[in-house]
Amino acid sequence: GQRVENHSNIVSEAALTGKTINIIDAYSSTAFKFTGTKKFDRGTGYRSKSFLTIPLKNAQNYVIGVLQLINSIEPQTGNVVPFGRDIEPLVEALASQAAVALENQNLIESQKHLLDSFVRLMAGTVDAKSPYTAGHCQRVPVLTEMLTQAACDSAKAPFADFSLNEEQWYELHIAAWLHDCGKVTTPEYVVDKATKLETITDRLHEIRMRFEVVKREAVIECQQKMLDGARNGVELKQILDERLRSLDDDFEFVAECNRGGEFMDEERIQRLQQIAGIQWTRTLNDRLGIAQEELNRKSQQPEASLPVKENLLADRADHIIAHDTVVYSADPLNPYGFQVEVPPHKYNLGEVYNLSIARGTLTTEERFKINDHIVQTIVMLESLPFPQHMEGVPEIAGGHHEKMDGTGYPKKLKGTEMSVPARIMAIADVFEALTAADRPYKKAKTLSESINIMAGMVKDHHLDGELFKLFLESGVYQDYATKYLESYQLDDICLDDYLAAD
């Protein structure tokens, strides 16, 4: 609706006009109602009389507040007297200083609000990149702060003396929300890789077509022999049928390998290599219409004359993609202290190489690329000019993949080299990942399964044992589970099984 200005209230009038107002006696004033003042006086027995109301103006001369002085006291008699006109300039000067202080405070709050909004925007962007990690960057801060509060509340060693002041809480808050900000550099098709041959698309479709070509070639070869009359037609048909059945079986095996559900032992790898040796005939130029980057890789090898026999599955030189920049962690003298084994290539798209992955769907190169998100997180956060009270943000955010025994990632820090908040975030990150129900590639684990896995990680010196004990004893795990886990995940656990072992 239309804005209505209130000129009957002295504070509103000062704010609207930007002028100082000096009232001798509120009860005899006809300019303003003083309704609130009189109600206050009736309730308290106080007698409000003289008023000096000064607008607070910032450097741009905008009114940002109002300073009001009530009941000037005459020092000799102690009586309430009007505010002298001669002191108005002095009070206005003091009000200007108050306005500067208020403006600075407002600016600090605005900057803090802007930073918070940007941090949440960044976390939301990371979560939105992939349905596989949806909500992770928003839930980890919640769990981190819950466990940190439990540590602050604990009266037992080793957390009896642990506490955070307001600035340290804010530092933890920012670090928790930005702990995976480096994932903005991780390609979605690597994070989301659901099969071994998947890149932007699943290359199994291309291999299926090659099998179809081989089958057609077998049919044509059989029919040609029948026409030549070199062998008995019935016998040739039996050989063809057996050949087609064998190819169908081979493709089913390749497709099964592509899923990544079973361990690839030596026997399976040998069969895969035998299938790879089956040849098919390519009659078209494979360098036409492709991207310049791929053409550059193919051009490193001499072009074969057509038609050419090619293996059904191949590990070619053009499948190797080199690192396009110097990897931070490849330099042993890097300024961040990263100690990471960097694979020789950025990616290896070799078909046999990918299908031979022992467990899961990721190659060594792809796993490095995913793990590299924490390196990028640290590099990104170290580049920001955090104020002194927030200088610990990179350490807290960048430590959640480290392990207590020093075998973690990316600095191989031991637990004694990490802050308590960093060790807390490691527990929060693992528990959230195990229990997350919004990951399309896996079913969320139950509460008991998750706690059991984490207990094993404590036994292997990957997670902090004291913090894990606090996680259980304080009930943080249960409070979080009640709010964020699905009903089917909320099974019973016997705490004594884990606390007694401690």
Label each residue range with its predicted role.
Residues 20, 30-32, 108-116, 156-163, ...:
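Short, glycine/acidic-rich hinge or "gate" loops at secondary-structure transitions
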Residues 65-66, 424:
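PAS (Per-ARNT-Sim) sensory domains
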Residues 49-58, 63-65:
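A short, aliphatic-rich beta-strand micro-motif
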Residues 54, 59, 70-72, 416:
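Output-coupling edge of small sensory domains
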Residues 62-64, 70-94, 362-364, 441-444:
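Regulatory loop-to-helix N-cap segments in sensory/regulatory domains
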